[in-house]
Design a protein with these regions (language model features):
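Residue-level signal for inorganic ion chemistry
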Residues: 1, 20, 81, 85, ...
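G-domain G4 guanine-recognition motif of GTPases
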Residues: 1-5, 25-26, 185-191
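Phosphate-binding loop of NTP-binding sites
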Residues: 2-4, 8-18, 310, 314
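Asparagine-centered polar/low-complexity signal
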Residues: 3, 78-81, 134
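Glycine-rich nucleotide phosphate-binding loop and flanking beta-alpha elements
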Residues: 7-10, 29, 190, 246-247
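Extended acidic/charged loop-beta regions that coordinate divalent cations
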Residues: 10-68, 105-120
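ATP-dependent carboxylate-amine ligase
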Residues: 64, 75, 87-97, 101-319
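A short glycine/serine-rich beta->alpha loop
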Residues: 69-76
Length: 319
């Protein structure tokens, strides 16, 4: 099972003794189309549904709206994971209905996927827990966080000691461009590095950014996470990278004991609104200024000129 969207992975095809199944979010991916034209297998997304294809035959496996891990298809890297898992299960001989049931019942929370883009809320604070420890993982995470409305952002982060200096510094620079407060921890995976050597490399990178104002080196993953949580303010976004999955579970237990709860992506990206009276009746007003490109509301269905109680006004004459 190979990622058709990554040229380096596509090149591994020549080393595969068995049959190859490709996956890609884009149904028009050139590698996927070429592979299908020769009768090969592929998994991709069309109309927000997972498709299993072999040659010209397509099977609609499941809508991403029914796959909790992807948060309705809003988290691209989790969609990739679902495509890869679906392709692997299919190649192993599982029937499509069994694969679909598995995807629909595998949750995005701590119980099924601890440390893999778990979302929490507590006392007005939104928390994202993700275990990614490298440039690629951080880049993908940041692309998803761009949809979050939170203005103030903090992160708890580190890296294993066997990462290259240039990669640690690069992660620091990315963090320095996206977060106001940074909590750097050192814990389990020094792997030959001296104490605080990793944190100092991160600081080099953070200094290249233009956003971070506060940096706190802290010994221990869980200690750093708790410090960040206890000093956060309502309305803030806190990104937490546990040092180990066990730390992630321990953190969730603390959050739960204090009244926190797991939330969905839709809840996490929702903007604060106020309900006010207007000449049209009660109306929702944004609780903050929107930026260009922000999604205000989503709806499905045809655009019509008649106003009904089931329509949303999107222009002066369109509903």
């Amino acid at each position: 099972v190979l990622n058709a969207a990554d040229p380096l992975v596509v090149g591994m095809r020549k080393y595969c003794d068995g049959s190859v199944t490709f996956f890609a979010r884009d149904p028009d991916n050139a590698v996927v189309r070429e592979h299908l034209s020769t009768g090969g297998r592929a998994a991709y997304v069309r109309d927000n549904s997972v498709i299993l294809a072999e040659g010209d035959a397509e099977t609609v496996l499941v809508s991403l709206e029914r796959v909790p891990l992807t948060h309705g298809g809003l988290v691209p890297f989790q969609v990739d994971n679902v495509l890869a898992a679906s392709a692997a299960a299919w190649a192993a001989g599982l029937p499509p209905d069994a694969i679909a049931r598995g995807l629909a019942t595998f949750r995005a929370g701590v119980g099924h996927a601890p440390g893999r883009f778990n979302l929490f809320a507590i006392d007005g604070l939104t928390i994202v827990a993700d275990y990614g420890h490298n440039v690629s993982a951080l880049n993908r995470l940041l692309s998803v966080l761009a949809a979050f409305p939170h203005e103030k952002r903090s992160i708890v982060y580190s890296a294993a000691g066997d990462r290259r200096d240039v990669d640690i510094i690069a992660q620091g620079e990315m963090i320095g461009r996206h977060f106001d407060r940074v909590f750097l921890y050192e814990d389990t995976y020094l792997r030959g590095r001296k104490d605080w050597e990793i944190a100092n490399l991160f600081k080099q990178g953070i200094s290249l950014g233009d956003r971070t104002k506060e940096v706190y080196p802290i010994k221990g993953s869980l200690a750093a996470i708790l410090r960040a949580t206890e000093t956060a303010t309502p309305g803030e976004l806190l990104v937490v990278q546990p040092d180990t999955i066990d730390d992630g579970i321990a953190f969730w237990n603390v959050i739960q004991s204090r009244g926190g709860r797991e939330i969905t992506m839709s809840e996490a990206v929702a903007c604060d609104v106020e309900i006010r009276e207007s000449r049209f009746g009660r109306a929702a007003h944004a609780g903050r200024a929107f930026a260009p490109g922000d999604v205000v509301v989503k709806g499905r269905g045809p655009v019509i000129r008649e106003r009904t109680k089931y329509t949303i006004q999107i222009d002066r004459d369109l509903h």
